[in-house]
Amino acid sequence: MSKTYLTEKKFSDFALHPKVIEALEKKGFSNCTQIQALTLPITVKGHDIAGQAQTGTGKTLAFLTSTFHYLLTHPAKEGHEKNQPRALIMAPTRELAVQIYTDAQPLAQSTGVKMGLAYGGDGYDEQLKVLNNGVDIVIGTTGRLIDYVKQGHINLNAIQVVVLDEADRMYDLGFIKDIRWLFRRMPNAAERMNMLFSATLSYRVRELAFEQMNNPEYVEVEPEQKTGFSIKEELFYPSNEEKMRLLQTLIEEEWPERCIIFANTKHRCDDIWAHLAADGHRVGLLTGDVPQKKRLRILEDFTQGNIDILVATDVAARGLHIPSVTHVFNYDLPDDCEDYVHRIGRTGRAGKSGNSISLACEEYALNLPAIETYIQHAIPVSKYNSDALLTDLPEPKRRHRPRQGQPRRNNSAPRRGNNTQRNNRNKRPSHS
Protein backbone atom coordinates (compact mmCIF):
# COMPACT_ATOMS: atom_id res chain seq x y z
CA MET A 1 0.00 0.00 0.00
CA SER A 2 1.25 3.47 -0.81
CA LYS A 3 2.08 5.62 2.15
CA THR A 4 0.54 8.63 0.39
CA TYR A 5 -2.74 9.75 1.93
CA LEU A 6 -4.40 11.03 -1.26
CA THR A 7 -4.53 9.17 -4.56
CA GLU A 8 -4.34 10.58 -8.07
CA LYS A 9 -8.00 9.70 -8.54
CA LYS A 10 -10.32 12.73 -8.44
CA PHE A 11 -13.98 12.84 -7.45
CA SER A 12 -14.68 14.39 -10.85
CA ASP A 13 -13.36 11.21 -12.49
CA PHE A 14 -16.50 9.39 -11.36
CA ALA A 15 -20.00 9.83 -12.74
CA LEU A 16 -21.21 11.57 -9.60
CA HIS A 17 -24.24 13.87 -9.64
CA PRO A 18 -23.17 17.47 -10.46
CA LYS A 19 -24.58 18.79 -7.17
CA VAL A 20 -22.45 16.30 -5.24
CA ILE A 21 -19.35 17.39 -7.14
CA GLU A 22 -20.26 21.03 -6.47
CA ALA A 23 -20.52 20.40 -2.72
CA LEU A 24 -17.19 18.58 -2.64
CA GLU A 25 -15.41 21.31 -4.59
CA LYS A 26 -16.80 24.02 -2.29
CA LYS A 27 -15.22 22.20 0.66
CA GLY A 28 -11.93 21.82 -1.18
CA PHE A 29 -12.21 18.07 -1.81
CA SER A 30 -10.59 17.21 -5.12
CA ASN A 31 -8.55 14.02 -4.85
CA CYS A 32 -9.85 10.83 -3.26
CA THR A 33 -8.34 8.92 -0.40
CA GLN A 34 -7.70 5.25 -1.03
CA ILE A 35 -10.96 4.04 0.52
CA GLN A 36 -12.91 6.63 -1.47
CA ALA A 37 -11.17 5.65 -4.71
CA LEU A 38 -12.07 2.01 -4.05
CA THR A 39 -15.64 2.71 -2.93
CA LEU A 40 -17.00 5.06 -5.59
CA PRO A 41 -16.55 2.80 -8.65
CA ILE A 42 -18.78 0.30 -6.87
CA THR A 43 -21.42 2.57 -5.36
CA VAL A 44 -21.98 4.81 -8.40
CA LYS A 45 -23.27 1.62 -10.04
CA GLY A 46 -25.58 1.02 -7.08
CA HIS A 47 -23.73 -2.09 -5.92
CA ASP A 48 -23.21 -3.08 -2.28
CA ILE A 49 -19.87 -2.67 -0.55
CA ALA A 50 -18.19 -3.79 2.66
CA GLY A 51 -15.13 -1.67 3.26
CA GLN A 52 -12.23 -1.85 5.66
CA ALA A 53 -9.88 1.08 6.14
CA GLN A 54 -7.61 2.46 8.80
CA THR A 55 -9.28 5.00 11.07
CA GLY A 56 -9.13 8.52 9.67
CA THR A 57 -8.77 7.66 5.99
CA GLY A 58 -12.06 9.07 4.73
CA LYS A 59 -14.67 6.35 5.23
CA THR A 60 -17.34 8.86 6.21
CA LEU A 61 -17.03 10.95 3.06
CA ALA A 62 -16.98 7.75 1.01
CA PHE A 63 -20.39 6.61 2.19
CA LEU A 64 -21.89 10.11 2.38
CA THR A 65 -20.91 10.87 -1.21
CA SER A 66 -22.34 7.52 -2.29
CA THR A 67 -25.59 8.04 -0.38
CA PHE A 68 -26.30 11.52 -1.73
CA HIS A 69 -25.44 10.45 -5.28
CA TYR A 70 -27.81 7.50 -5.09
CA LEU A 71 -30.72 9.56 -3.75
CA LEU A 72 -30.23 12.21 -6.44
CA THR A 73 -30.06 9.69 -9.28
CA HIS A 74 -32.88 7.37 -8.19
CA PRO A 75 -36.52 8.36 -7.67
CA ALA A 76 -38.23 7.83 -4.35
CA LYS A 77 -40.39 4.74 -4.09
CA GLU A 78 -43.93 5.10 -5.37
CA GLY A 79 -46.33 6.14 -2.62
CA HIS A 80 -43.47 7.41 -0.46
CA GLU A 81 -44.86 9.01 2.74
CA LYS A 82 -43.53 11.75 5.02
CA ASN A 83 -42.49 9.35 7.81
CA GLN A 84 -40.56 7.16 5.38
CA PRO A 85 -36.91 8.19 5.02
CA ARG A 86 -35.07 7.05 1.92
CA ALA A 87 -31.72 6.40 3.59
CA LEU A 88 -30.64 5.20 7.02
CA ILE A 89 -27.14 5.64 8.46
CA MET A 90 -26.50 3.71 11.68
CA ALA A 91 -23.64 4.55 14.04
CA PRO A 92 -22.56 2.95 17.34
CA THR A 93 -22.43 6.16 19.41
CA ARG A 94 -24.27 9.45 19.72
CA GLU A 95 -21.07 11.38 19.16
CA LEU A 96 -20.38 9.60 15.89
CA ALA A 97 -23.96 10.11 14.69
CA VAL A 98 -23.65 13.85 15.33
CA GLN A 99 -20.26 13.91 13.62
CA ILE A 100 -21.64 12.20 10.51
CA TYR A 101 -24.56 14.65 10.46
CA THR A 102 -22.14 17.58 10.68
CA ASP A 103 -19.92 16.18 7.93
CA ALA A 104 -22.98 15.75 5.70
CA GLN A 105 -24.17 19.36 6.04
CA PRO A 106 -22.28 20.73 2.99
CA LEU A 107 -23.76 17.98 0.82
CA ALA A 108 -27.24 18.61 2.20
CA GLN A 109 -26.99 22.34 1.57
CA SER A 110 -25.88 21.89 -2.04
CA THR A 111 -28.35 19.16 -2.91
CA GLY A 112 -31.46 20.05 -0.93
CA VAL A 113 -31.55 16.58 0.61
CA LYS A 114 -33.12 16.79 4.08
CA MET A 115 -31.58 15.06 7.09
CA GLY A 116 -32.59 14.21 10.64
CA LEU A 117 -30.89 12.82 13.74
CA ALA A 118 -32.09 10.06 16.05
CA TYR A 119 -29.90 9.33 19.07
CA GLY A 120 -30.57 8.67 22.74
CA GLY A 121 -29.68 10.66 25.81
CA ASP A 122 -31.56 13.87 25.14
CA GLY A 123 -33.21 15.92 22.41
CA TYR A 124 -36.13 13.51 21.99
CA ASP A 125 -38.75 16.12 21.10
CA GLU A 126 -36.34 18.25 19.06
CA GLN A 127 -35.31 15.28 16.95
CA LEU A 128 -38.91 14.17 16.54
CA LYS A 129 -40.00 17.61 15.34
CA VAL A 130 -37.48 17.46 12.49
CA LEU A 131 -38.41 13.89 11.59
CA ASN A 132 -42.14 14.66 11.57
CA ASN A 133 -41.54 17.33 8.93
CA GLY A 134 -40.14 14.63 6.67
CA VAL A 135 -36.50 13.82 5.95
CA ASP A 136 -34.65 11.92 3.26
CA ILE A 137 -31.82 10.65 5.45
CA VAL A 138 -31.93 9.59 9.09
CA ILE A 139 -28.62 9.31 10.95
CA GLY A 140 -28.77 7.71 14.35
CA THR A 141 -28.11 5.07 16.95
CA THR A 142 -30.07 1.84 17.07
CA GLY A 143 -31.89 2.34 20.38
CA ARG A 144 -33.53 5.65 19.50
CA LEU A 145 -34.22 4.45 15.96
CA ILE A 146 -36.10 1.42 17.28
CA ASP A 147 -38.05 3.67 19.65
CA TYR A 148 -39.19 5.92 16.81
CA VAL A 149 -40.03 2.95 14.57
CA LYS A 150 -42.12 1.27 17.26
CA GLN A 151 -44.06 4.49 17.83
CA GLY A 152 -44.68 4.95 14.11
CA HIS A 153 -42.65 8.12 13.77
CA ILE A 154 -40.31 6.37 11.34
CA ASN A 155 -41.34 3.76 8.77
CA LEU A 156 -38.54 1.87 7.05
CA ASN A 157 -40.53 0.39 4.16
CA ALA A 158 -39.20 2.94 1.66
CA ILE A 159 -35.51 2.68 2.54
CA GLN A 160 -33.28 2.74 -0.55
CA VAL A 161 -29.83 3.15 1.04
CA VAL A 162 -28.47 1.68 4.27
CA VAL A 163 -25.11 2.48 5.84
CA LEU A 164 -23.67 0.64 8.82
CA ASP A 165 -20.65 2.53 10.14
CA GLU A 166 -18.12 1.02 12.58
CA ALA A 167 -19.75 -2.40 12.32
CA ASP A 168 -17.17 -4.05 14.55
CA ARG A 169 -17.89 -1.50 17.27
CA MET A 170 -21.60 -2.33 16.96
CA TYR A 171 -20.75 -5.88 17.93
CA ASP A 172 -18.52 -4.75 20.78
CA LEU A 173 -21.35 -2.66 22.25
CA GLY A 174 -23.94 -5.43 21.90
CA PHE A 175 -26.10 -3.74 19.26
CA ILE A 176 -26.21 -6.58 16.76
CA LYS A 177 -29.75 -7.68 17.74
CA ASP A 178 -30.97 -4.11 17.30
CA ILE A 179 -29.37 -3.93 13.87
CA ARG A 180 -31.05 -7.14 12.75
CA TRP A 181 -34.38 -5.88 14.14
CA LEU A 182 -34.11 -2.75 12.01
CA PHE A 183 -33.04 -4.66 8.89
CA ARG A 184 -36.12 -6.90 9.16
CA ARG A 185 -38.33 -3.83 8.77
CA MET A 186 -36.73 -2.64 5.55
CA PRO A 187 -37.20 -3.80 1.96
CA ASN A 188 -35.11 -6.85 1.17
CA ALA A 189 -31.43 -6.40 0.45
CA ALA A 190 -31.83 -6.60 -3.34
CA GLU A 191 -34.14 -3.56 -3.29
CA ARG A 192 -31.67 -1.20 -1.62
CA MET A 193 -28.00 -0.25 -1.76
CA ASN A 194 -26.11 -1.41 1.31
CA MET A 195 -22.80 -0.10 2.63
CA LEU A 196 -20.87 -1.42 5.60
CA PHE A 197 -17.67 0.17 6.85
CA SER A 198 -15.45 -1.01 9.64
CA ALA A 199 -11.92 -0.68 10.95
CA THR A 200 -11.74 -4.47 10.84
CA LEU A 201 -13.63 -6.96 8.67
CA SER A 202 -13.71 -9.81 11.15
CA TYR A 203 -15.55 -13.07 10.59
CA ARG A 204 -18.61 -11.84 12.45
CA VAL A 205 -18.71 -8.60 10.43
CA ARG A 206 -18.47 -10.57 7.19
CA GLU A 207 -21.24 -12.84 8.44
CA LEU A 208 -23.46 -9.79 8.99
CA ALA A 209 -22.65 -8.57 5.48
CA PHE A 210 -23.60 -11.97 4.05
CA GLU A 211 -26.90 -11.92 5.96
CA GLN A 212 -28.06 -8.38 5.28
CA MET A 213 -26.42 -7.30 2.03
CA ASN A 214 -26.80 -8.17 -1.65
CA ASN A 215 -23.57 -9.85 -2.74
CA PRO A 216 -21.32 -7.03 -1.50
CA GLU A 217 -17.89 -6.34 -2.91
CA TYR A 218 -15.18 -6.34 -0.25
CA VAL A 219 -12.51 -3.66 -0.34
CA GLU A 220 -9.67 -3.26 2.12
CA VAL A 221 -7.16 -0.52 2.76
CA GLU A 222 -4.78 -2.23 5.16
CA PRO A 223 -1.57 -0.46 6.09
CA GLU A 224 1.60 -2.51 6.37
CA GLN A 225 1.55 -1.72 10.07
CA LYS A 226 -1.77 -1.29 11.81
CA THR A 227 -0.72 1.79 13.74
CA GLY A 228 0.14 3.84 10.65
CA PHE A 229 3.36 5.21 9.26
CA SER A 230 2.65 8.75 10.39
CA ILE A 231 2.45 7.97 14.13
CA LYS A 232 5.56 8.01 16.30
CA GLU A 233 5.08 5.54 19.14
CA GLU A 234 6.84 5.61 22.51
CA LEU A 235 6.54 3.52 25.67
CA PHE A 236 7.52 4.17 29.30
CA TYR A 237 7.53 1.81 32.29
CA PRO A 238 6.55 3.95 35.31
CA SER A 239 5.81 2.71 38.79
CA ASN A 240 2.25 3.31 39.96
CA GLU A 241 3.55 5.98 42.35
CA GLU A 242 5.30 7.93 39.58
CA LYS A 243 2.76 7.45 36.82
CA MET A 244 0.82 10.69 37.28
CA ARG A 245 3.95 12.79 37.71
CA LEU A 246 5.45 11.24 34.58
CA LEU A 247 2.33 12.13 32.60
CA GLN A 248 2.41 15.73 33.81
CA THR A 249 6.14 15.99 33.13
CA LEU A 250 5.68 14.70 29.60
CA ILE A 251 2.85 17.17 28.98
CA GLU A 252 5.01 20.02 30.25
CA GLU A 253 7.84 18.95 27.97
CA GLU A 254 5.83 18.03 24.89
CA TRP A 255 3.28 20.82 25.42
CA PRO A 256 0.99 19.32 22.76
CA GLU A 257 -1.18 21.60 20.68
CA ARG A 258 -4.11 19.21 21.09
CA CYS A 259 -4.02 15.83 22.80
CA ILE A 260 -6.24 13.04 24.07
CA ILE A 261 -5.40 11.07 27.22
CA PHE A 262 -7.04 7.65 27.41
CA ALA A 263 -7.64 5.69 30.59
CA ASN A 264 -9.48 2.42 31.15
CA THR A 265 -11.99 3.54 33.77
CA LYS A 266 -14.17 6.53 34.54
CA HIS A 267 -12.61 6.84 37.99
CA ARG A 268 -9.11 7.03 36.50
CA CYS A 269 -10.25 9.65 34.00
CA ASP A 270 -11.75 11.72 36.82
CA ASP A 271 -8.44 11.57 38.66
CA ILE A 272 -6.38 12.61 35.63
CA TRP A 273 -8.77 15.48 34.89
CA ALA A 274 -8.58 16.69 38.49
CA HIS A 275 -4.76 16.76 38.48
CA LEU A 276 -4.48 18.54 35.14
CA ALA A 277 -7.24 21.04 35.90
CA ALA A 278 -5.59 21.91 39.21
CA ASP A 279 -2.34 22.49 37.33
CA GLY A 280 -4.04 25.08 35.13
CA HIS A 281 -4.40 23.14 31.90
CA ARG A 282 -7.37 23.67 29.59
CA VAL A 283 -8.78 20.19 29.97
CA GLY A 284 -12.09 18.48 29.20
CA LEU A 285 -13.52 15.20 30.46
CA LEU A 286 -15.39 12.73 28.25
CA THR A 287 -16.77 9.67 30.04
CA GLY A 288 -20.02 7.77 29.92
CA ASP A 289 -21.70 9.63 32.78
CA VAL A 290 -21.15 13.11 31.32
CA PRO A 291 -24.56 14.40 30.09
CA GLN A 292 -24.98 14.34 26.32
CA LYS A 293 -25.28 18.10 25.84
CA LYS A 294 -22.14 18.63 27.88
CA ARG A 295 -20.31 15.91 25.93
CA LEU A 296 -21.13 17.63 22.65
CA ARG A 297 -20.07 21.00 24.05
CA ILE A 298 -16.76 19.55 25.25
CA LEU A 299 -16.11 17.98 21.84
CA GLU A 300 -16.92 21.28 20.16
CA ASP A 301 -14.58 23.16 22.51
CA PHE A 302 -11.85 20.63 21.82
CA THR A 303 -12.35 20.84 18.07
CA GLN A 304 -12.36 24.65 18.16
CA GLY A 305 -9.21 24.81 20.28
CA ASN A 306 -10.85 26.14 23.44
CA ILE A 307 -9.66 22.98 25.20
CA ASP A 308 -6.16 21.61 24.66
CA ILE A 309 -6.45 18.26 26.45
CA LEU A 310 -9.30 15.75 26.39
CA VAL A 311 -9.33 12.99 29.02
CA ALA A 312 -11.49 10.11 27.87
CA THR A 313 -12.48 6.50 28.15
CA ASP A 314 -12.81 4.53 24.94
CA VAL A 315 -16.17 6.19 24.25
CA ALA A 316 -14.13 8.77 22.32
CA ALA A 317 -11.77 6.35 20.63
CA ARG A 318 -13.89 5.31 17.68
CA GLY A 319 -15.26 7.26 14.78
CA LEU A 320 -14.85 10.83 15.97
CA HIS A 321 -13.22 13.12 13.45
CA ILE A 322 -11.26 15.60 15.52
CA PRO A 323 -8.69 17.40 13.37
CA SER A 324 -5.10 18.16 14.29
CA VAL A 325 -4.71 15.95 17.37
CA THR A 326 -0.94 16.04 17.81
CA HIS A 327 -0.57 13.60 20.71
CA VAL A 328 -2.34 10.61 22.21
CA PHE A 329 -1.38 9.43 25.70
CA ASN A 330 -2.35 5.94 26.80
CA TYR A 331 -2.30 6.51 30.55
CA ASP A 332 -3.50 2.91 30.84
CA LEU A 333 -2.67 0.28 28.25
CA PRO A 334 -6.06 -0.96 26.99
CA ASP A 335 -7.30 -4.45 27.80
CA ASP A 336 -8.35 -4.96 24.17
CA CYS A 337 -5.42 -4.81 21.75
CA GLU A 338 -7.66 -3.43 18.98
CA ASP A 339 -8.48 -0.47 21.21
CA TYR A 340 -4.80 0.48 21.16
CA VAL A 341 -4.99 0.94 17.40
CA HIS A 342 -8.26 2.84 17.59
CA ARG A 343 -6.99 5.10 20.35
CA ILE A 344 -3.78 6.17 18.70
CA GLY A 345 -5.64 6.50 15.41
CA ARG A 346 -6.98 9.78 16.80
CA THR A 347 -3.63 11.30 15.81
CA GLY A 348 -1.72 11.06 12.55
CA ARG A 349 -4.93 11.57 10.56
CA ALA A 350 -5.42 12.93 7.06
CA GLY A 351 -1.78 12.38 6.20
CA LYS A 352 -0.45 14.38 9.15
CA SER A 353 2.11 13.12 11.64
CA GLY A 354 1.25 12.33 15.24
CA ASN A 355 2.67 11.08 18.52
CA SER A 356 1.53 8.23 20.75
CA ILE A 357 2.97 7.88 24.26
CA SER A 358 1.97 4.89 26.38
CA LEU A 359 2.57 4.20 30.06
CA ALA A 360 2.99 0.51 30.90
CA CYS A 361 2.42 0.55 34.65
CA GLU A 362 2.42 -2.35 37.08
CA GLU A 363 -1.33 -2.80 36.66
CA TYR A 364 -1.57 -2.90 32.86
CA ALA A 365 1.90 -3.90 31.61
CA LEU A 366 0.60 -7.45 31.10
CA ASN A 367 -1.52 -6.12 28.22
CA LEU A 368 1.58 -5.16 26.23
CA PRO A 369 2.52 -8.54 24.65
CA ALA A 370 -0.92 -8.96 23.08
CA ILE A 371 -0.85 -5.38 21.79
CA GLU A 372 2.59 -5.79 20.21
CA THR A 373 1.58 -9.11 18.67
CA TYR A 374 -1.51 -7.50 17.18
CA ILE A 375 0.31 -4.46 15.73
CA GLN A 376 3.18 -6.72 14.59
CA HIS A 377 5.99 -4.64 16.03
CA ALA A 378 7.51 -3.71 19.36
CA ILE A 379 6.77 -0.23 20.68
CA PRO A 380 10.03 1.71 21.17
CA VAL A 381 10.88 2.05 24.87
CA SER A 382 12.17 5.23 26.51
CA LYS A 383 13.62 5.55 30.00
CA TYR A 384 13.17 8.42 32.41
CA ASN A 385 14.97 9.84 35.41
CA SER A 386 12.77 9.78 38.51
CA ASP A 387 14.63 12.76 39.93
CA ALA A 388 13.65 14.84 36.89
CA LEU A 389 9.89 14.38 37.36
CA LEU A 390 7.87 17.41 38.39
CA THR A 391 7.29 17.76 42.11
CA ASP A 392 5.82 21.25 42.56
CA LEU A 393 2.32 20.17 41.57
CA PRO A 394 -0.93 21.32 43.20
CA GLU A 395 -3.40 18.96 44.82
CA PRO A 396 -6.10 17.67 42.45
CA LYS A 397 -9.29 19.72 42.46
CA ARG A 398 -12.87 18.61 42.68
CA ARG A 399 -14.49 17.75 39.37
CA HIS A 400 -16.68 20.87 39.29
CA ARG A 401 -13.71 23.17 39.74
CA PRO A 402 -12.29 24.72 37.64
CA ARG A 403 -14.73 25.02 34.77
CA GLN A 404 -14.05 23.14 31.55
CA GLY A 405 -11.78 25.18 29.36
CA GLN A 406 -9.95 27.15 32.06
CA PRO A 407 -6.86 28.71 30.44
CA ARG A 408 -3.52 27.01 31.00
CA ARG A 409 -1.55 28.73 33.73
CA ASN A 410 -4.36 31.29 34.08
CA ASN A 411 -3.69 32.47 30.51
CA SER A 412 -0.28 33.80 31.52
CA ALA A 413 1.99 30.97 30.39
CA PRO A 414 3.71 31.01 27.01
CA ARG A 415 3.40 27.95 24.76
CA ARG A 416 6.73 26.50 25.93
CA GLY A 417 6.72 28.04 29.40
CA ASN A 418 9.25 30.22 31.18
CA ASN A 419 9.02 28.52 34.56
CA THR A 420 12.73 28.55 35.49
CA GLN A 421 12.42 25.90 38.15
CA ARG A 422 10.80 23.45 35.75
CA ASN A 423 12.67 24.31 32.60
CA ASN A 424 16.06 23.91 34.28
CA ARG A 425 15.33 20.24 34.81
CA ASN A 426 16.18 17.56 32.35
CA LYS A 427 12.55 16.52 32.23
CA ARG A 428 12.53 14.66 28.91
CA PRO A 429 13.26 10.97 29.48
CA SER A 430 16.30 9.62 27.71
CA HIS A 431 15.80 7.03 24.97
CA SER A 432 17.05 3.52 25.32
UniProtKB/Swiss-Prot annotation:
Please give the CDD domains that the UniProt record associates with this protein: DEADc, SF2_C_DEAD
Per the annotation, the residue ranges of the short sequence motif DEAD box are 165-168
Where in or outside the cell?
Answer: Cytoplasm
SUPFAM superfamilies linked:
P-loop containing nucleoside triphosphate hydrolases (SSF52540)
Xref: PROSITE patterns: DEAD_ATP_HELICASE, HELICASE_ATP_BIND_1, HELICASE_CTER, Q_MOTIF
Membrane-crossing ranges are none
- InterPro entries in the record: DEAD/DEAH_box_helicase_dom, DEAD_box_RNA_helicase, Helicase_ATP-bd, Helicase_C-like, P-loop_NTPase, RNA-helicase_DEAD-box_CS, RNA_helicase_ATP-dep_RhlB, RNA_helicase_DEAD_Q_motif
GO BP terms: RNA catabolic process
The UniProt record lists the Helicase ATP-binding domain at: 40-219
Give its E.C. classification number.
Answer: 3.6.4.13
Cite the binding residues for ATP: 53-60
NAD found in the keyword field: no
- The UniProt annotation puts motif Q motif at 9-37
Q: Name one Pfam family in it.
A: DEAD
Location of the Helicase C-terminal domain: 245-390
- Biased-composition ranges for Low complexity? 404-423
Reaction catalysed by this chain?
ATP + H2O = ADP + phosphate + H(+)
Primary subcellular site in the record, as a coarse category: cytoplasm
Q: Name one GO molecular function term.
A: RNA helicase activity
Q: Which family does it belong to?
A: Belongs to the DEAD box helicase family. RhlB subfamily.
Q: How does it assemble?
A: Component of the RNA degradosome, which is a multiprotein complex involved in RNA processing and mRNA degradation.
Cite the PANTHER family for this sequence.
ATP-DEPENDENT RNA HELICASE RHLB, ATP-DEPENDENT RNA HELICASE RHLE-RELATED
- Function noted in UniProt: DEAD-box RNA helicase involved in RNA degradation. Has RNA-dependent ATPase activity and unwinds double-stranded RNA.
Question: Could you identify this protein by its name?
Answer: ATP-dependent RNA helicase RhlB
> What organism does this protein naturally occur in?
Proteus mirabilis (strain HI4320)
